[in-house]
């Protein structure tokens, strides 16, 4: 044993301790001294002539250990035989020099010093404990004031501050009856004399007696800190330091450069400063120097220690010779370049290389081409081993030589070594897990790595100079995992949405499309063939062409009852190309999948179907064959682009003239004052938008058809073989929007701020642009480039926050047994089913039985995983909604259960235990982030036009139903006018399933009745898109109030038109203060001149005009129900700025309160209005029991309810963006989840990105993981504190078992950054953001990190508790428990 120890001196008993948790705390002076190997007394570092460390200095060999292995400083003892001897001459212990990396020293401070983290890291912990303000504590610490530490019998207060003059006056007055101190001594005295237990008692009593919210918060915070100290057994005065530990010298090296200069770590400067000041202070104290000098020196010492610990936290940062702030201990660990992110979470690895990538079109899916040079270097150890084994080399040195000479045997051995040894390829940025995949290397000449074209989509790689890194898995386990889990051919489906990610693109698509298109009257049309071989012969002898329509007998394979394949022969009418393609179909895939022109979407469906029907292996082989075929026919097709392919439609000139005429007409109307400037702009933009679309349509119609003569000599249309059209139509490259710019018109352009320039570019690229048009276009083009550069960083940051909040979420058990879940319905918007029910529930587990609505029988039992078969069955039976399990309601404590998560999207079956679903969710949401531009102009263009819809039409036949919020009145023309704010017309089909849902704005005229049968294309409602009306619900005679011209309303005369109208003036703009509160209103009188009241109440009808309203009625005018009183131009009330794209997603996940948030009803009840205050309206809701809830709303806000309306809790009452916190509070978790999922999906859908809902739900689960204790009961929590949901549940269960009162709690929603920082693991939080704050808090709380999450385990250098690491962690825990039980048993037997 001792012999072994000789060679392994560092692995003594203490080093290899198994540990299960890491605890952080504040070190006591004794602890610091116990770490130390000696006191550093001098600021010297090394002797500049001998380069030997000075004795007692910062690099002293006596304290920190020898500079050279097994050699003392003076050279008396050398070599291993003297190991452990301490030299009597120089005092150095003979041992390994690497102890200089771990031996610490210490500095005995002549005066105590406060630790800056506990002082300045907000909120100040010292301030909290002492209940003093930070300002006061600083005045004491930096010697500006005295603090009374012991008032004795005097009337002074403990902790009272005295200025110097005060102090001397009081001394004269009271003599030695009281104690007051300055500096850290004073603070330390206060801390030492504070009775923690007593203080806690007092605070708990105060907490119960006090009523004010702010006070409760303040006391609770103090209580938390004091209880933490009490619990952990740390003393308060340890926050003040007597002893300063010194970092081991090799961690702050000093390296001699040539020319007698030294490169040194900043820490040495900072330590030197501390030692100098400390020694000076010692000397001054010995000399009994005057007080003022000593004080100054103590203050300087405090400042020196401050900047050593955290430079720049207080006052100016200390700078070195180069005027840069010195890098202190705190800077070493925080930020991107700090210890956590640079060295612990991101290490560089050996056995890796990188090179440019190029295409390997002949590779199989699981292969990649690896340059021989790289392979030789990467696989060196394996080659050395083989050379020695085969006896070609006797030592490693000899083997090295052989490899360097590159003798022929080495290449043979390399081939052997590489066979079946997977390597991993990675392309930065690795945005999701498919950014690293394993391949089998094929040795190639040249220096570029060859990559299979089909995996490019997963890596987001192209061959314009991208580079990739290669890593070699060394151990057998690593090779096994690479092969089974990471091999490219095992990753066919995308983890984000479960669709194939190995989908052909570009040339391959074009080749397959060209091959499967049909041509009218091609050579040999109508021939019949006995089998595909005959078709081959005919094609090769040029009897038929690729597109020739023929009839052929094909053999297909169908599964019989026993599950075996049987051949079936069918006749098909098809084309030559499709018949040839049928040869590569896997067994069991029907021919009809390829019996059509294959576009990109179709090919994706084809591969998906193949995966579901034929399994992984056949699909991979099929994908490879598709690729080879596609490339082959793309080459044979020779499709190219010429300028003539961009055909400009003949109708263009006429369409442009028509649009110009319309614009001219609008301009005329504007001159006559019929429309406002804003309306004119909206309409002009609208006209040009429509004109652009019409031209595009004419152009596409023109491009997509060509006239040909068929066999009978008639002229017929067939789909065009225009190259540009084929590329766009197949989905290979380009889109209709791009072709529109090539040969239609470029259309409207956006300014950099997103607003649209109203003069469009009428030319296209083929005609060429004028200088002005070119100039207009540069705006948008440059913004695009600037955006791209900026948005990448934002996207990366979002992904980082998401990963951090979900990193510890792992599937840990099979089933948590809950029956909770969410009800899923199809997403219907406008007339379209955006996401069908089947897509939303596929791969979920049912939470309750699914029942057939017509027969009432159970279709699917609760707890069943819904496969494709089952969802199709549910779909056909007409079920409208299904309750499914969801991660948000999962009851598993630390992690998730497989049933609540459902199907693992990338594997197509129930998720395995150990799958890191949190990280996968974060990557799936973050990865497309780069594609979500900051509010792109596509949206800029679309938003302006969507606003101009003026009617809704039904898209399908069915029955119209009005939503529950629908309110309308009939006007005197008999039209139904909508007066509700959130009304919808829903259309149900014959079985009663919801097919469409249309929003109808306030003031729209309904053209259908509730329950009426309607036909597709029927108009449901119409309205004026450019103004918002104000409508009366009662009939009567108009009587104005507060209608003073020039005070509340202004007669506006349009400069251009000379017509005038009354417009309500903004209250802020009015001259006198009295008139600011006046609001122009309209009352209604009956024929006797009495004010009309709201039916059933005695409140008179009174409608206030909002600011900017143009009043359309006159005093004394008779009006009927549903008449328009005023119109509010839409241009002035701009449509709310829609935050789009990435910022919107970030806003949702950060749970930010939107500015100008809308308001939701707090309770269910009846609305009434109370007395108005200055600038605010008072809205009162009274519930059934007569309890009133009132709230003040500023007058600018648009109130959506009116007197006497009944509202439900959580219904919107004031217009504005919804605050997610309100939804959670008033409508509960399910409504909140539905809102966030819906809103996030909206953003991704606009970009055409598909993400499974469950990923968003996983993030929401983490945002809801903490709860607020409303009433602690007898659980030991503090009322008002936030705790982990799991801890709270556990505490409540325990309380109930013991018959105590459980805690009541309320759900709270945390943004992802907040949630990451509030995790139980301080290591994970500290490595994310705000390192200083997290560590300070953790140290005071004496926190223990259980190392449950992935990040903590990466940091301490363990396998992560996910995937194959989960079993490792579980077996470790079992071993531990076994050991613990054994020790317990032995103790029992001993007794």
Swiss-Prot record:
Any single Gene Ontology cellular-component annotation: DNA-directed RNA polymerase complex
Binding site for Mg(2+): 462, 464, 466
Record: residues binding Zn(2+) 1: 72, 74, 87, 90
Catalysed transformations (reactions): RNA(n) + a ribonucleoside 5'-triphosphate = RNA(n+1) + diphosphate
EC category: transferase
InterPro entries to which the protein is assigned, alphabetical: DNA-dir_RpoC_beta_prime, DNA-dir_RpoC_beta_prime_bact, RNA_pol_asu, RNA_pol_N, RNA_pol_Rpb1_1, RNA_pol_Rpb1_3, RNA_pol_Rpb1_3_sf, RNA_pol_Rpb1_4
GO biological process, one term: DNA-templated transcription
Gene3D superfamilies from the UniProt entry: 1.10.132.30, 1.10.150.390, 1.10.1790.20, 1.10.40.90, 2.40.40.20, 2.40.50.100, RNA polymerase II, clamp domain, RNA polymerase Rpb1, domain 3
Cofactor binding note: Binds 1 Mg(2+) ion per subunit.
PANTHER family: DNA-DIRECTED RNA POLYMERASE, DNA-DIRECTED RNA POLYMERASE SUBUNIT BETA
Subunit and partners: The RNAP catalytic core consists of 2 alpha, 1 beta, 1 beta' and 1 omega subunit. When a sigma factor is associated with the core the holoenzyme is formed, which can initiate transcription.
Function: DNA-dependent RNA polymerase catalyzes the transcription of DNA into RNA using the four ribonucleoside triphosphates as substrates.
Protein known as: DNA-directed RNA polymerase subunit beta'
Organism: Neisseria gonorrhoeae (strain NCCP11945)
């Amino acid at each position: 044993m001792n012999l072994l120890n000789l060679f392994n001196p560092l692995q003594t008993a203490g080093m290899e301790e198994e540990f299960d948790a890491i605890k952080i705390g504040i070190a006591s002076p004794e602890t610091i001294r116990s770490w130390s190997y000696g006191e550093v007394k001098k600021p010297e570092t090394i002797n500049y002539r001998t380069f030997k460390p000075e004795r007692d200095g910062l690099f002293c060999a006596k304290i920190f250990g020898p500079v050279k292995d097994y050699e003392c400083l003076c050279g008396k003892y050398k070599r291993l035989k003297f190991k452990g001897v301490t030299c009597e001459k120089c005092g150095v212990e003979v041992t390994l020099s690497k102890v200089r990396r771990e031996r610490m020293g210490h500095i005995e401070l002549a005066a105590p010093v406060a630790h800056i983290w506990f002082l300045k890291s907000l909120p100040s912990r010292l301030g909290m404990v002492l209940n003093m303000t930070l300002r006061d504590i600083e005045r004491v610490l930096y010697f500006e004031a005295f603090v009374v530490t012991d008032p004795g019998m005097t009337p002074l207060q403990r902790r009272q501050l005295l200025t110097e003059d005060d102090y001397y006056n009081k001394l004269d007055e009271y003599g030695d009856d009281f104690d007051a101190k300055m500096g850290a001594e004073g603070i330390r005295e206060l801390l030492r004399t504070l009775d923690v237990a007593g203080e806690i008692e007092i605070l708990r009593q105060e907490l119960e007696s006090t009523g004010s919210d702010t006070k409760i918060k303040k006391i609770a915070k103090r209580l938390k800190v004091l209880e933490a100290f009490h619990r952990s057994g740390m003393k308060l005065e340890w926050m003040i330091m007597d002893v300063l530990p010194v970092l081991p010298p090799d961690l702050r090296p000093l390296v001699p450069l040539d020319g007698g200069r030294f490169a040194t770590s900043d820490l040495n400067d900072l330590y030197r400063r501390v030692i100098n000041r400390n020694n000076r202070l010692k000397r001054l104290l010995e000399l009994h120097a005057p007080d003022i000098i000593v004080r100054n020196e103590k203050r300087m010492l405090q400042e020196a220690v401050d900047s050593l610990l955290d430079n720049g936290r207080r006052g100016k940062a200390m700078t070195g010779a180069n005027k840069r702030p010195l890098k202190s201990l705190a800077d070493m660990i925080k930020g991107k370049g700090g210890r956590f992110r640079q060295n612990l979470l991101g290490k560089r690895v050996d056995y890796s290389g990188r090179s440019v990538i190029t295409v390997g079109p002949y590779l199989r899916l699981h292969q990649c081409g690896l340059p021989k040079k790289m392979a030789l270097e990467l696989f060196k150890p394996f080659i050395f081993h083989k050379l020695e084994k085969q006896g070609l080399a006797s030592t490693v040195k000899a083997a090295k030589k052989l490899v360097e000479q590159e003798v022929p045997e080495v290449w043979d051995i390399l081939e052997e070594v590489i066979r079946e040894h997977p390597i991993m390829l990675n392309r930065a940025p690795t945005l999701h897990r498919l950014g690293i995949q394993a391949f089998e290397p094929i040795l190639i000449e040249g220096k570029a790595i060859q990559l299979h074209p089909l995996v490019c989509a997963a890596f987001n790689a192209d061959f314009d100079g991208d580079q990739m890194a290669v890593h070699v898995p060394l151990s057998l386990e690593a090779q096994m995992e690479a092969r089974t889990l990471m091999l490219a051919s095992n990753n066919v489906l995308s983890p984000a949405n479960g669709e194939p990610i190995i989908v052909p693109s570009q040339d391959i698509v074009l080749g397959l499309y060209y091959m499967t298109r049909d041509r009218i009257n091609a050579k040999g049309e109508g021939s019949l063939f006995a089998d595909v071989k005959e078709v081959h012969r005919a094609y090769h002898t040029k009897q038929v062409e690729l597109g020739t329509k023929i009839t052929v007998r094909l053999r297909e394979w169908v599964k019989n009852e026993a599950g075996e394949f049987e051949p079936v022969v069918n006749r098909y009418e098809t084309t030559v190309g499709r018949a040839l393609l049928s040869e590569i179909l896997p067994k069991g895939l029907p021919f009809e999948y390829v019996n059509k022109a294959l576009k990109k979407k179709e090919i994706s469906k084809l591969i998906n179907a193949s995966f579901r029907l034929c399994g992984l292996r056949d699909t991979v082989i099929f994908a490879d064959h598709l690729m080879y075929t596609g490339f082959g026919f793309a080459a044979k097709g020779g499709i190219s682009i010429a300028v003539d392919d961009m055909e400009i439609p003949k109708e263009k000139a006429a369409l442009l003239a028509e649009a110009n005429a319309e614009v001219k007409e609008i301009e005329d109307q504007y001159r006559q004052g019929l429309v406002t400037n804003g309306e004119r702009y909206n309409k002009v933009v609208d006209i040009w938008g429509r004109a652009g679309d019409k031209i595009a349509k004419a152009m596409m119609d023109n491009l997509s058809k060509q006239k040909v003569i068929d066999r009978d000599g008639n002229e017929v249309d067939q789909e065009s073989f225009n190259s540009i059209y084929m590329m766009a139509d197949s989905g290979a490259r380009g889109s209709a929007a791009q072709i529109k710019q090539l040969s239609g018109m470029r259309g409207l352009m956006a300014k950099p701020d997103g607003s649209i320039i109203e003069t469009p570019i009428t030319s296209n690229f083929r005609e060429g642009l004028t200088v002005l048009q070119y100039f207009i276009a540069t705006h948008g083009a440059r913004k695009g480039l600037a955006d791209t550069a900026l948005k990448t960083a934002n996207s990366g940051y979002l992904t980082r926050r998401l990963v951090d909040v979900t990193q510890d979420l792992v599937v840990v058990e099979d089933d948590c047994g809950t029956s909770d879940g969410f009800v899923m319905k199809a997403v219907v918007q406008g007339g379209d089913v955006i996401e069908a029910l089947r897509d939303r529930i596929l791969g979920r587990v049912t939470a309750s039985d699914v029942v057939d609505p017509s027969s009432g029988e159970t279709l699917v039992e609760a707890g069943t995983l819904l496969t494709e078969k089952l969802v199709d069955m549910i779909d056909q039976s007409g079920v409208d909604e299904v309750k499914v399990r969801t991660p948000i309601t999962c009851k598993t404590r630390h992690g998730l259960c497989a049933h609540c998560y459902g199907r693992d999207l990338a594997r197509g079956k129930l998720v395995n235990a150990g799958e890191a679903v949190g990280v996968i969710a974060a990557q799936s949401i973050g990865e497309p982030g780069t594609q979500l531009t900051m509010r792109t102009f596509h949206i800029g263009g679309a938003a302006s036009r969507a606003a101009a819809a003026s009617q809704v039409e039904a898209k399908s036949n069915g029955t119209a139903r009005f939503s529950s919020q629908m309110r309308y009145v009939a006007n005197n023309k008999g039209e139904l006018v909508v007066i509700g704010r959130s009304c919808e017309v829903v259309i149900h089909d014959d079985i009663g399933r919801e097919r469409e849902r249309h929003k109808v704005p306030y003031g729209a005229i309904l053209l259908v009745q509730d329950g009426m049968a309607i036909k597709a294309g029927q108009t449901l409602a119409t309205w004026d898109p450019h103004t918002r009306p104000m409508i009366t619900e009662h009939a009567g005679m108009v009587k104005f109030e507060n209608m003073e011209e020039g005070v509340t309303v202004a007669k506006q005369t349009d400069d251009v038109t000379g017509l005038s109208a009354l417009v309500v003036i903004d209250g802020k703009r009015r001259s006198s203060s009295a008139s600011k509160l006046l609001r122009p209103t309209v009352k209604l009188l009956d024929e006797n001149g009495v004010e009309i009241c709201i039916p059933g109440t005695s409140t008179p009808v009174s409608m206030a005009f909002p600011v900017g309203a143009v009043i359309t009625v006159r005093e004394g005018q008779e009006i009927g129900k549903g008449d328009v009183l005023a119109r509010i131009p839409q241009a002035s009330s701009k449509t709310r700025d829609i935050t789009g794209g990435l910022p919107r997603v970030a806003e949702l996940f950060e749970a930010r309160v939107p500015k100008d948030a809308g308001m939701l009803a707090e309770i269910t009840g009846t609305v009434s209005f109370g007395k108005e205050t200055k600038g605010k309206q008072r809205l009162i809701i009274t519930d059934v029991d007569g309890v009133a809830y009132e709230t003040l709303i500023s007058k600018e806000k648009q109130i959506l309810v009116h007197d006497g309306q009944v509202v439900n809790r959580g219904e919107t009452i004031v217009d504005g963006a919804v605050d997610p916190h309100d939804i959670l509070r008033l409508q509960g978790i399910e409504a909140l989840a539905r809102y966030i999922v819906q809103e996030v999906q909206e953003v991704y859908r606009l970009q055409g990105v598909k993400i499974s809902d469950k990923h968003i739900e996983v993030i929401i689960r983490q945002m809801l993981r903490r709860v607020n204790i409303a009433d602690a009961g007898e659980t030991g929590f503090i009322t008002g504190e936030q705790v982990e949901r799991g801890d709270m549940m556990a505490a409540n269960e325990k309380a109930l078992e013991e018959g105590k009162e459980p805690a009541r709690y309320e759900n709270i929603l945390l943004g992802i950054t907040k949630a990451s920082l509030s995790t139980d693991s301080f290591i994970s939080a500290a490595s994310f953001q705000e390192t200083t704050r997290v560590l300070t808090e953790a140290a005071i709380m004496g926190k223990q990190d259980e190392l449950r999450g992935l990040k903590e385990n990466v940091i301490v250098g363990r396998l992560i508790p996910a995937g194959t690491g989960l079993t490792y962690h579980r077996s470790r825990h079992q071993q531990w428990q076994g050991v613990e039980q054994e020790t317990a048993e032995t103790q029992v037997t001993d007794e």
